[in-house]
Amino acid sequence: MARRKRQPVAGEIAEETRQTILRVAEQLFMTYGYRAVTTRQLAEVCGLTQPALYHYFADKEEIYLAVVSEEIAKIHLALERIVRRADTVSERLQAVAGFLLSRMHYDLNLMLHDVRYEVSTKTRDKLDIQFRQGFIVPIAAIFEQGIQRGELRDVTQGGMAAFPAAYLFMTMLSGFATRVPLNATPRDLQAYQAASAETCVRILLHGIARSHG
């Protein structure tokens, strides 16, 4: 006798619906920005009524917080794996840069603008903490290891401390993320990301001045 297919329980259906909302919200927020997206629009794309949407999230800001928090958590796991590699500082920073550029399928500056100006202070403070823990802490660990191993100069030698260096790295990288070639093929995009990662790290570690001597 054939086994009957197990029917999903209410909790599973609820979680599936929640993930659908987050997936759709990510696409809309990262394409149009926080202000331009409405809960009515979100509900329609998800095939829900607005009251049904509010069953899962209290308001648009709570949805945005959940979307960005999930993205930061995913990126943090990947960065931690790169940190644990036995490569040089330059190699690991290039790996970080290449990975982050490949994940920036949305306008990073748009997201940073939304976090700074469109959400409440409470939500902004939460995301600032998550950004520091998810992005900056693992990247700073690479710089700190480089200082400890003698690959990088410390502050007393004219270098930078690990955390300021990590923030500088992210600032430089965001500039490359906003200059992706228009109508690029997947192969072109991959080549651009690899070249940009190498250029970003090379300039960060060695500067743009001609060497003397």
What does each model-found stretch correspond to?
Residues 16-27, 31, 45, 62-84, ...:
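Alpha-helical structural segments
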Residues 59-62, 88, 157:
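Residue-level recognition of oxygen-bearing side chains
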Residues 2, 9, 20, 24, ...:
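Helix-turn-helix
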Residues 82, 111-119, 180-184:
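Secondary-structure edge/capping motif, primarily at the C-terminal ends of alpha-helices
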Residues 101-141, 151, 156-163:
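Short secondary-structure transition hinges
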